[in-house]
């Protein structure tokens, strides 16, 4: 399919069916588009909307975000996952405040230099917010292009990604780029979906190679399968009435900056930790274990609950706090921690 025909059909479809009233599309600014694009990485629109609205209510400008404590940013992000995005968001906002006087940069080089911003995100900000001619290549766009032009291979491989970037550059029109890029994302999200694509509703159906050969399931190529390693983590749930002991993780690494239960690889390490702090472990109780899966490994979590008689226990741990179940502080929590805290709120641990 010729590039001009491709873009014309996509734009015509967008005018009729595309999404035009998402929260970040109303009174568009580079800040709003950037925030939404970061949140939308590996996350569905319906999940992102309430988070975006809460962020905009609390941080209406990039300067507000830059001046906020990281704990508060992570707290508002809790449940959205991939917390490196939130940490990079905060760093980038501070960079905008420091280097650009709080005005969001408007050149590709400056935007791409922000933490957590790659080529596609920079292109999305420039095209969607400012109408500048930059292509994008998010997951939805990759899927549409790979199927239409039968691009084999996993897009995570550099040569496949380069082929898709070349196609994206070719089909992105000189005019109407903001509508076109939004249309491509909408097309992938609404019509050219991962499973059960609605090919009969697609404006590219007649020129799509995958549709012609009924081979959409082959494109894009899947990531080579690998068996995820398994690890075990013993979580220590120290409870004093309605207070639960949490410690802040280091700034980088797994759950960086979030508040979590003390974690150990083995139960004897957990008991040794308690003994060193003169905490009686007679009433230590194992709760139901469960699995939490990361992108690169499975973590089998074994919660170990222990009621304590004093808040003084373990408060020499630096960045630690007693989390009040009735009046939760504004701190970021890892998803398994939130799950266990909710379990403790409902009453006796099981």
From Swiss-Prot:
InterPro entries: A/G_AdeGlyc_MutY, DNA_glycosylase, Endonuclease-III-like_CS2, Endonuclease3_FeS-loop_motif, Endouclease-III_FeS-bd_BS, HhH-GPD_domain, HhH_base_excis_C, HhH_motif
Its job: Adenine glycosylase active on G-A mispairs. MutY also corrects error-prone DNA synthesis past GO lesions which are due to the oxidatively damaged form of guanine: 7,8-dihydro-8-oxoguanine (8-oxo-dGTP).
NCBIfam families for this protein: mutY, PRK10880.1
Cleavable signal peptide: none
A Pfam family of this chain: HHH
The UniProt record lists the keyword DNA repair: yes
Family: Belongs to the Nth/MutY family.
Cofactor details (free text): Binds 1 [4Fe-4S] cluster. The cluster does not appear to play a role in catalysis, but is probably involved in the proper positioning of the enzyme along the DNA strand.
SMART domains assigned: ENDO3c, FES
Keyword Transmembrane helix assigned: no
Organism: Salmonella typhimurium (strain LT2 / SGSC1412 / ATCC 700720)
Cofactor: [4Fe-4S] cluster
Gene3D superfamilies (UniProt xref): Helix-hairpin-Helix base-excision DNA repair enzymes (C-terminal), Hypothetical protein, domain 2, Nucleoside Triphosphate Pyrophosphohydrolase
Binding positions ([4Fe-4S] cluster): 192, 199, 202, 208
Name of the protein: Adenine DNA glycosylase
EC number: 3.2.2.31
Reaction equations catalysed: Hydrolyzes free adenine bases from 7,8-dihydro-8-oxoguanine:adenine mismatched double-stranded DNA, leaving an apurinic site
Enzyme class: hydrolase
Positions annotated as active site in the UniProt record: 37
Record keywords: 4Fe-4S, DNA damage, DNA repair, Glycosidase, Hydrolase, Iron, Iron-sulfur, Metal-binding
GO biological process: base-excision repair; mismatch repair
Residues carrying the site annotation Transition state stabilizer: 138
Oligomer status and interactors: Monomer.
């Amino acid at each position: 399919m010729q590039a001009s025909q491709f873009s014309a059909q996509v734009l015509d479809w967008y005018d009729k069916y595309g999404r035009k009233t998402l929260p970040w599309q109303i009174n568009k600014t580079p800040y709003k588009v950037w925030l939404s694009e970061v949140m939308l990485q590996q996350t569905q629109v319906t999940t992102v909307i309430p988070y975006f609205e809460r962020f905009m209510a609390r941080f209406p400008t990039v300067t507000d975000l830059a001046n906020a404590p990281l704990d508060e940013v992570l707290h508002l992000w809790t449940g959205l996952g991939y917390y490196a995005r939130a940490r990079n968001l905060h760093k980038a906002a501070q960079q905008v405040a420091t280097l650009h006087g709080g005005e969001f940069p408007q050149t590709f080089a400056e935007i791409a230099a922000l933490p957590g911003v790659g080529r596609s995100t920079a292109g999305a900000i420039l095209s969607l917010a400012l109408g500048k001619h930059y292509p994008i290549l998010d997951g939805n766009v990759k899927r549409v292009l790979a199927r239409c032009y039968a691009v084999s291979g996993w897009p995570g491989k550099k040569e496949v990604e380069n082929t898709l970037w070349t196609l994206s550059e070719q089909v992105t029109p000189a005019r109407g780029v903001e509508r076109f890029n939004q249309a491509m994302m909408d097309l992938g999200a609404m019509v050219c979906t991962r499973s059960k694509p609605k090919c009969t509703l697609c404006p590219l159906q007649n020129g799509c190679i995958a549709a012609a050969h009924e081979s959409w399931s082959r494109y894009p190529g899947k990531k080579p399968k690998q068996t995820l390693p398994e690890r075990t983590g013993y979580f220590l749930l120290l409870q004093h009435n309605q207070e639960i002991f949490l410690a802040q993780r280091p700034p980088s690494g797994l759950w960086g900056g979030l508040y979590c239960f003390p974690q150990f690889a083995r139960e004897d390490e957990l008991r040794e930790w308690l003994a060193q702090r003169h905490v009686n472990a007679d009433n230590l109780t194992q709760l139901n274990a469960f699995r939490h899966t990361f992108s690169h490994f499975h973590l089998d979590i074994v919660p170990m609950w222990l009621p304590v008689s004093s808040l003084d226990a373990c408060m020499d741990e630096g960045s630690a706090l007693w989390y009040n179940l009735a009046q939760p502080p504004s701190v970021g929590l890892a998803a398994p921690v939130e799950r266990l805290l909710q379990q403790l709120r409902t009453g006796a641990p099981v």
